[in-house]
Design a protein with these regions (language model features):
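Basic DNA-binding region of bZIP-type proteins
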Residues: 116-142
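Positively charged, structured surface patches that bind polyanionic biopolymers
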Residues: 1-122
Length: 142
């Protein structure tokens, strides 16, 4: 008899934990979101994808795995320079338009790739606290 783990339980468990890894569907250039980004932005899409990867990396260690939508702060994190907030805004807005990021009701920047891993990792944490062994092949004893 097993009890399933809800997404709310998973989110609560992984809220302030750094995600150890992030699974991405590769190659990125074959995703529908990237194709849309490429159609709209041309060669700038490759820079946008670099920004997206950096934002994903930042979000994996940020509490709640969502970033504040503060372009000055994002520019500092992305470029190491506070004066580039308009460039950060341009990239982030392009990612939002392509569906690679979205704004939450709380005004934070969420990344769907991170959200998926956040819930998956939270379920692993909850499952681990319940004890037991994961189901797998039973080994034969000789």
């Amino acid at each position: 008899m097993s009890r399933t783990i809800s997404e709310d339980e998973a989110i609560e468990a992984a809220w302030s934990v750094q995600l150890p890894s992030l699974r991405l569907n590769m190659p990125l250039s074959s995703s529908n979101e990237f194709k849309l980004l490429r159609d709209v932005r041309g060669d700038k899409a490759y820079t946008d994808m670099g920004v997206w990867l950096r934002l994903c990396s930042l979000a994996t260690s940020y509490k709640g795995h969502a970033l504040p939508l503060d372009y000055e702060q994002l520019a500092q994190w992305l470029f190491g320079n506070v004066g580039k907030s308009t460039i950060a805004a341009e990239h982030v807005n392009a990612l939002i338009a392509a569906g690679l990021a979205f704004l939450g009701a709380d005004g934070s920047l969420y990344l769907p790739a991170v959200e998926t891993e956040f819930v998956r990792y939270g379920k692993m944490i909850v499952g681990g606290t319940r004890g037991g062994r994961p189901r797998g092949k039973k080994k034969r004893r000789h």
